[in-house]
């Protein structure tokens, strides 16, 4: 009902829902696909909206092409397998929040998702990505989708206020900054509980520490701004708890 109401209020926009009735039961090999001529019609409208949004935000833009790199698809499936087997909660979240992942080739795109194509992740892996990069980007976009769903129930953030973004040079609407904070908190929460060994151990520790610093800086901007709803404030408190727990455990491990 909430989704139908959202669609009804946005009739001028092309809106697609990839969270179908049975999407959570589909296998990951079915849900992770490469963008190719035979499925072009399925994703053309989505990729057009991605291109328009990138240009609207004055970001560097390069055309989105088909992807013939099946190795990227295998890497994504490996990352999902690692996350899914790490915990039942993660497996449930992945299956219910991600309806489809489409792999494209685009120099200026990393990954993106939107409430306008709910449940779909558009991703453009790079040759130098490690398994860690795949995991982080999947969690990143999954977190955005989770928040889009929550915002169908409650806006969480008031409009008309601009704040500093941890991922952009220019100030962004408070909603975008709230999304950034939520993504950072989810990256910390999920990845801190993963076990990285060998060549991934140090980069994982460095990236998590960087994420914690960015989250602290980002959450501080919502203090005394009065731009969050009651539910939004509650979520900000939960993010603060994730940060505090990470900092506490990180300081203990440093002593040990």
Predicted regions located by residue number:
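N-terminal low-structure segments adjacent to metalloprotease catalytic domains
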Residues: 1-52
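Short, charged/polar micro-motifs that form catalytic or ligand-binding hotspots
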Residues: 62-73, 124-137, 169-180
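Pan-zinc metallopeptidase signature
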Residues: 205-256
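Post-HEXXH active-site segment of zinc metalloproteases
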Residues: 114, 128-136, 145-175
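Post-HExxH zinc-binding segment in Zn-dependent metallohydrolases
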Residues: 162-199
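Short, glycine/acidic-rich hinge or "gate" loops at secondary-structure transitions
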Residues: 93-95, 155-156, 197-207
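Auxiliary, metal-adjacent structural segments of Zn-dependent hydrolase domains
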Residues: 53-117, 127
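Long, acidic, intrinsically disordered low-complexity segments
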Residues: 75-82, 86, 114-147, 242-256
């Amino acid at each position: 009902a909430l989704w139908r109401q959202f669609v009804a209020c946005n009739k001028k926009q092309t809106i697609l829902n990839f969270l179908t009735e049975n999407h959570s039961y589909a296998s990951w090999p079915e849900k992770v696909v490469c963008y190719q001529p035979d499925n072009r019609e399925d994703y053309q409208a989505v990729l057009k909206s991605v291109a328009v949004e990138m240009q609207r935000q004055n970001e560097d833009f390069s055309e989105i092409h088909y992807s013939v790199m099946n190795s990227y698809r295998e890497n994504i499936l490996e990352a999902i397998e690692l996350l899914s087997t790490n915990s039942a909660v993660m497996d449930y979240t992945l299956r219910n929040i991600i309806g489809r992942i489409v792999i494209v080739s685009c120099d200026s795109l990393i990954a993106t998702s939107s409430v306008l194509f709910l449940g779909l992740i558009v991703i453009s892996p790079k040759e130098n990505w490690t398994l860690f990069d795949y995991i982080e980007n999947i969690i990143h976009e999954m977190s955005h989708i989770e928040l889009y769903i929550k915002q169908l129930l409650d806006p969480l953030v008031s409009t008309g206020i601009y704040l500093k973004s941890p991922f952009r040079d220019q100030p962004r609407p408070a909603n975008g900054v709230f999304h950034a904070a939520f993504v950072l908190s989810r990256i910390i929460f999920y990845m801190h509980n993963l076990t990285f060994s060998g060549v991934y151990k140090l980069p994982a520790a460095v990236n998590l520490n960087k994420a914690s610093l960015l989250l602290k800086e980002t959450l501080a901007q919502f203090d005394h701004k009065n731009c969050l709803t009651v539910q939004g404030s509650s979520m900000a408190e939960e993010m603060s708890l994730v940060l505090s727990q990470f900092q506490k455990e990180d300081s203990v491990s440093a002593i040990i």
